[in-house]
Regions:
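Charged docking surfaces used in two-component/phosphorelay signaling
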Residues: 9, 69, 158-332
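N-terminal Rossmann-like NAD(P) cofactor-binding subdomain of oxidoreductases
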Residues: 1-191, 227-228, 252, 292-293, ...
Length: 332
């Protein structure tokens, strides 16, 4: 596919705007670029490569000449337009969760399973942001020994809830500073100076839908259908970049030295691990970056076959927009 026509569905949202930025940064070869959104955004201009692209309304006809469609819209919008996109012969790289677990839809992290993208039937799904960041960090270790299980706790930034998340955090901090009452709208409780241990809806055995994604999506991406994952997802008062504490268990023991070497050599990873010198991954450092930072690598004291680590990554870039553009690059 040479100089494909690219259409962004949901171009005015945070992920859609980041897709535009990343397409330009990576010099993605584009024939024609179209930006689609809802009717209320029609007529707005978005900047790309020194020019302005006018936003058009998303309709079935708007995909007629597309070769690649980058989806940055909600599930219902993705499902609404997927048939029209497929009918044109375009490839729909979708960031929503609408198709992730469909058997005939590849779920792809290019550093891990790029070959899966080549077996698509018109749709390729982008995994959940926390799934991408976690798996990029641990995938290098599976080359040393198969992963049998993982226990993870995510610390997810407020921007993961949309553009209103950082606005609400800032407003609450300002209100508290002035001694005024806090009125949450985006989150169920005050997020300023607080943690909220629920992201998503109630799902299975007391887990939330967000927590089950790491197991369900991880199994599919790693081709490990029996891998067991327990996850706790927490919203934290950080503006951007998610962090994950992971304990991974393997078929054989892996030394810390082996793990560090594997992660240092892994695509998409940056080893940041020198505890005595206070060097470790932090969300502030990974914001606006595409690499996943990995550190705090140490033995699991409860299981000789386990390793613990801490990873951070920008959930808007590598956790969403960059991963989608990388998938598109596989199709060129």
């Amino acid at each position: 596919m040479k100089n494909p026509n690219v259409t962004i569905l949901g171009a005015t949202g945070a992920v859609g705007r980041e897709m535009l930025k990343i397409l330009e940064e990576r010099s993605f070869p584009i024939g024609e670029l179209r930006c689609l959104a809802s009717a209320r955004s029609v007529g707005k201009n978005l900047s790309f490569a020194g020019r302005e692209i006018m936003v058009e309304e998303a309709t079935d006809a708007a995909f007629t000449d597309a070769d690649i469609v980058l989806g940055a819209a909600e599930n219902d919008i993705a499902r609404r337009f997927a048939p029209a996109i497929k009918a044109t012969g375009a490839v729909f790289i979708d960031n929503s969760s609408a198709f992730r677990m469909d058997e005939d839809v590849p779920l792809v992290v290019p550093e891990i399973n790029p070959e899966d993208a080549l077996h698509h039937h018109g749709i390729i799904a982008n995994p959940n942001c926390s799934t991408i960041i976690t798996l990029v960090a641990v995938a290098a270790l599976r080359r040393l020994s198969p992963i049998t299980s993982m226990v993870a706790a995510t610390y997810q930034a407020v921007s993961g809830a949309g553009a209103g998340g950082p606005v609400e955090l800032e407003a609450e901090v300002d209100a508290l500073y002035k001694g005024e009452p806090v009125q949450p709208h985006i989150f169920p409780y005050q997020i300023a100076y607080n943690l909220i241990p629920k992201i998503g809806s109630q799902s299975y055995e007391g887990y939330t839908s967000e927590e089950m994604k790491l197991q369900n999506e991880g199994r599919k991406i790693l081709h490990l259908p029996e891998m067991k994952v327990s996850c706790t997802c927490v919203r934290v008062p950080v503006v951007r970049s998610h962090s994950i504490a992971v304990t991974a268990r393997f078929e054989r023991p892996i030394s810390v030295e082996e793990a560090r070497a594997a992660i240092a050599a892994a695509p998409g990873c940056q080893l940041v691990d020198d505890l005595p010198q206070d060097i470790y991954p932090m969300p502030l450092d990974t914001s606006d970056q595409d690499l996943v930072y990995v550190g705090r690598i140490r033995p699991d004291l409860t299981n000789p076959n386990g390793l613990c680590l801490w990873c951070c990554g920008d959930q808007i870039r590598k956790g969403a927009a960059t991963n989608a553009v990388q998938i598109a690059e596989l199709l060129l």
